[in-house]
Design a protein with these regions (language model features):
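Bacterial N-terminal signal peptides that target proteins for export
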Residues: 1-8
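Repetitive helical segments and hydrophobic/amphipathic motifs
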Residues: 13-15
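N-terminal signal peptide c-region/cleavage motif recognized by signal peptidases
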Residues: 17-19
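SH3-family beta-barrel domains
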Residues: 21-44, 55-59, 66-71, 75-111, ...
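Beta-strand-rich domains and repeat architectures in extracellular enzymes and scaffolds
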Residues: 51-52
């Protein structure tokens, strides 16, 4: 009897913690994430049997998570160009990144228009995001960073706050 109780308890524990381990499952969609792998296939449906529609070769590219299938095994995403499809959940990271859109983004030493410009980033540059508040985010590109207006980036909402 004790053995069966231990097995049952273990099964319940695994069942309750599995979504927490996946991480992505617990969030309400849509939300921003990024591609974790250097090569990642987008598919037309949530299984390896569906054909690949795109091969991404850019780790940290920001994506918008639209749906989660099979407890996080498959994630429906949208890329910065608006293309939608499915990726394996293991290829998606919670790491927040942004992509410079439109014109050159000015990175400043403080989150305000009067801040000194310390770097400039061209359209298409991807960087890590942090400290987002009141329409500004700290944008780090391989150790060189500064504050940029969130509306110059794809991968963060202008009203969003990040630590």
């Amino acid at each position: 009897m004790r053995f069966k109780a231990k097995i049952l308890l273990a099964m319940v524990t695994v069942g309750l913690t599995a979504p927490a381990i996946a991480g992505l499952v617990l969030k309400k969609t849509p939300y921003f994430a990024s591609i974790a792998a250097g090569k990642a296939r987008m598919r037309t449906g949530p299984a390896k049997t569906y054909p690949a529609s795109w091969l991404y070769q850019r780790a940290d590219l920001p994506v918008k998570v639209l749906d989660v299938y099979d407890r996080g095994a498959w994630i429906k995403i949208e890329d910065p160009s608006g293309t939608q499809g499915w990726m394996m959940g293991t290829l998606i990271s919670d790491t927040r990144t942004g992509l410079v859109m439109g014109t050159i983004a000015e990175l400043r030493d403080s989150p305000r228009y009067g801040g000194k410009i310390v770097w400039r980033a061209a359209p298409g540059v991807v960087g890590r995001l942090s400290k987002c508040a009141r329409g500004w985010c700290y944008f780090d590109v391989r150790g060189r960073g500064g504050f940029v207006e969130a509306n110059h980036l794809w991968g963060v909402a202008t009203e969003e706050s990040l630590n």
